[in-house]
A protein has these predicted regions:
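A detector of single, family-specific signature residues
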Residues: 1-224
């Protein structure tokens, strides 16, 4: 029953993340329509500078010389103050400001709900599965959020998976065996559990950037 609850929270988190990404894309489209090209210069549309600029615009502040004060100094140094001011210069109507405010509020609500689910998962795992939670976090690339997600999607009874290959196959990360008359038609991965697959892929990327571990060295040699 506890695993089922964790799974509900976990999949809700993934749905909320997708929703937030869609809203961020909508927000950027609204800015682009006003000829504001800030996304060309910030690392991503979820950055603090980007959010602060949107907040000021939704409050009715449209002067680029005022908006540029919300941009991180590193971005200004990299691209130049004049370039950033030009990117913040656009034509913004009252309707545009209202739409941005509404989208921003929707993102804030989704982020709050996401954090509530994360807190609930952490609370359950620390109470019921503290040993498994601690052990999972010793794996390179696996932090608290990933550990709770793995417990939710896999459970704690590993007797269901005889080998690591069985688990990889269940998550959909094992290439399919589509061969006929010694001709390989496809090596695409199977469908599997898309939530588990997403978590494992995120962990593998994190592990490839963890200094001193095998995955980091393997990833480096693969790119050479």
């Amino acid at each position: 029953e506890r695993i089922q609850q964790l799974r509900q929270y976990d999949r809700r988190i993934f749905d909320l993340e997708d929703e937030i990404n869609r809203k961020l894309s909508k927000l950027d489209a609204a800015l682009q329509r006003c000829n504001i090209r800030l996304s060309n210069y910030v690392s991503n549309t979820d950055s603090k500078s980007y959010k602060e600029v949107v907040a000021r615009i939704s409050e009715g502040i449209t002067d680029p010389k005022v908006l540029v004060e919300e941009i991180h100094g590193r971005i200004i140094n990299r691209h130049g103050r004049k370039t950033i001011i030009a990117a913040l210069t656009g034509v913004i109507t009252q309707a545009d400001s209202d739409m941005m405010r509404q989208i921003r509020e929707e993102i804030d609500i989704a982020e709050r709900h996401k954090q509530e689910c994360i807190d609930k998962m952490q609370e359950i795992c620390e109470k019921e599965y503290s040993d498994q939670l601690r052990n999972l976090q010793t794996i390179p690339g696996v932090k608290l959020r990933a550990a709770t997600s793995l417990i939710a999607e896999i459970g704690i009874d590993m007797s269901h998976f005889e080998t690591a290959n069985h688990l990889a196959s269940w998550s959909g990360l094992k290439p399919r065996n589509d061969e006929s008359n010694k001709v390989i038609k496809s090596k695409r991965i199977t469908h599997g559990n898309r939530y588990l697959r997403r978590t494992i892929i995120e962990c593998s990327w994190a592990a490839s950037r963890t200094q001193g571990c095998f995955f980091s060295r393997f990833s480096y040699h693969q790119t050479q």
